[in-house]
C-alpha cells in the first residue's frame, strides 16, 4: 500500500491518490491550526468510533453505498484513483429499467463490473500520477469529475445532470440528501508540506455532539461517506486542516 505522501496535488483542481495508515485514530482536536499537517488516513472517523463517541442530534441518509475496497480495485484493475472509486460507487447506486446501472460491489457474492471502473477512469480524463508495484495511481481534475461522469452515464442510456463548485456550504449537502441525490465531496489538506486531496461519495449528513467527557460539547456537521479505501466513515465537514473543499452534485 502506497504512502499518502507519495504524490501531492499541484493545484486546486487535482485530486490525488492518497491512502490511510493501517490504524485508525481519533481525529485531531478542532483547535488545531488551520494549516496543521495531517495524514489523510487520520481524518475519516470509523463508524464504530463515531457512534461510541458522538451523540447524533439529527441526520439523514440516502442509504448505504455499494462499494469496492481499494484492495479489490487494485487486484482486479491494476489501478486506483479516489475520484474514480467514488464515482464507481455512485454508478452502482443508479438504476436503469429497474436494474443497477453497474455492479460496484462484491457484497452478497456479486461480481463487480471492473471494466466499468476503467471506463469511468477514461471518461473523467483521469491521468496516471505514478506506478508502484504494478498499480497505476491516478489523479482527476475536479472540474472533469462531474461532466465526465455525466457523459459516461448518458452513453449507457442514463440521463444524469451535474453541478460543481468550490467551497460548498453544508446546507447544500442536506438538500441533496433530502432529494435522494448523489454527491462527491473533495477536500485538500496539508500533509508534511504537500497539499494532498481526496474525493469521497456521500451517503448522508449528521449533526452530532461529543458524548459527555469528550469535549467540545457543541454540535458539529459531519458527512457520512465511503472513505474510498475500506468502508463507510464520517468526515468532520469543518475539519480545521482542510485548505480547500469542492463538491460535485448529481441529479436525475
Predicted regions and their residues:
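Active-site-adjacent structural segments surrounding the nucleophilic cysteine of cysteine proteases
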Residues: 1-138
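Ser/Thr- (and often Asn-) enriched beta-sheet segments in non-cytosolic proteins
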Residues: 27, 44, 159-161, 224
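Active-site signature of cysteine proteases
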Residues: 2-7, 169-171, 178-179, 186-252
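Generic detector of intrinsically disordered, low-complexity, polar/charged segments
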Residues: 5, 38, 60, 95, ...
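Predominantly the structural core of cysteine protease catalytic domains
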Residues: 88-89, 122-208
